[in-house]
């Protein structure tokens, strides 16, 4: 016999994908104790029923029962249509805590006030440090709720148990939960200041190194043996024993720096963690994220961030001052006037910013940087993982891709899912995702992600509602404005298209028969700007802006294909293999992949998915991807090597992955330059330590690309092989 008496409660049934009936039973109503004012330890609650715990004979009986059930309508969330495809069936979600969809910021703050109770705690870590933790518990005590936690260095305002979120700051409100849909559905939301930040005790360490795991008993007992993983573990233990009304399951999420902490939560291996979502996670600050790309310092981002974020915090504080103001109206002019990097401390920071000093002290990828790369620890991850990133994320695009690759290669199959959409940093959470920088994407891509992917992910793994069975990679094709799915990323069904750079400025699949060169003169006193015009600060929409201004410069060399006679979809990393020489002793190589639109292309505001590549006008040169390589690191990031003047050498590197459709009638273009300022610091083009270089070290030089049968090439991974 199969005893199913433990399934008491209202069953919820609806028609699922492909006409399959789906059913879920909510946990039977149980009394929930009010929050203990003295914060004494409470007995951990456990769920009364999970499908995984059912005997096989029960599962068979349940399967037979499902075949006879009739679909019953339940409250669901509205789902946006996706591209040219019909909207997929609404996933089975739990009965919402909040009856009405939360479509405005005011509706969100009203719902938090009406349906949640706020608590604040100082949660003890194993070394005695107390971390400020805010917990919002659903007022509905008839159900047990999973925890959904984020840990952050940016603060968890408003502070004070009687102060609730308001609608005055949309960006801050989006940090409350992964999406407003999840606030509607109901979770125990946990927000924590990481150690040493804001109202938490202890010392903050930027990109704190992870301890080697498994932790030995002496490290566990040692008060100095702490990292973000141990703090996550200790926090979860405390929550399970001190916050009533939970179902024993924990999800961890975060965007950017909190995204790193989410990834490290998976490393902590606490058994209560069932779902983790690192979104734009900070990963490796020397190779590809935030503050360095291939060894080149991301000058404007690093300086502007640490001039504010990096200020000393002697004691816990609820306020974070972010008020550094450049003394120039234009960001390009400000950093050019700053001069050599050492002037940042001399003129502005005055050695007060600890991590800026670390940046300056570690110019190469030494042990300091290796210890701060978490990816070697991404082994045997147990929770389900949803990695999210944006194709136009100017800060942590690389981190999303690298985190997925590292976890996927070291974790059981089908536990790691990657989602990449047409978003800037955090755009999937903070915007509709229907356009960016004047380029239309045809529909509200962020709504599709939040409602079709993210909400079902957490609902399935934390509540057991419905089934979440995505493809391993759910990816948006820019240029074509379509969602596509892949079994892995980069996809296996690609073929390399190697394009040779020819002397006549042509990109060709045919190798040149003669050896030639293309040279340009690069002056560090007049570096190539990141965008045309004046801007008081970085505008991260530059990642898809028109590059015609750069093509007109004599210090930028361009190569383009003939007009494409069919669509070409590039899917994966783009490989640069240049043979380059300089009459100096160092240089940077910047390569941009560009989509050149036909001269007769027109602006579009269409909402269909098969629109042209957006709202850029005819002849526009839309940036698809760009990357820099600091030449001295062409062999090894740890061991820089000078160029011998006049001697050609191989410089090989990859541009971060793309998934872009170059449409029929368009052209492919490559731009090559030696600076991209102030996105990246200037290379003096003299082989000296750049972080301590003097004005006299910055010298103009001529750089030369060698072309021909064994010359410079770029290789694109294409889904549909098309010869330009």
Where are these regions (language model features)?
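Alpha/beta-hydrolase fold nucleophile elbow
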Residues: 244-256
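Residue-level detector of structural "landmarks"
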Residues: 22-30
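Cap/lid segment of the alpha/beta-hydrolase catalytic domain
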Residues: 142-242, 291, 430-441, 585, ...
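N-terminal cap/lid segment of alpha/beta-hydrolase-fold proteins
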Residues: 104-141, 560, 564-566, 639, ...
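C-terminal, loop-rich substrate-recognition/catalytic regions characterized by aromatic stacking residues
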Residues: 89-93, 326-329, 336-341, 433-724
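Short beta-strand/loop motif that positions the catalytic acidic residue
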Residues: 381, 387-389
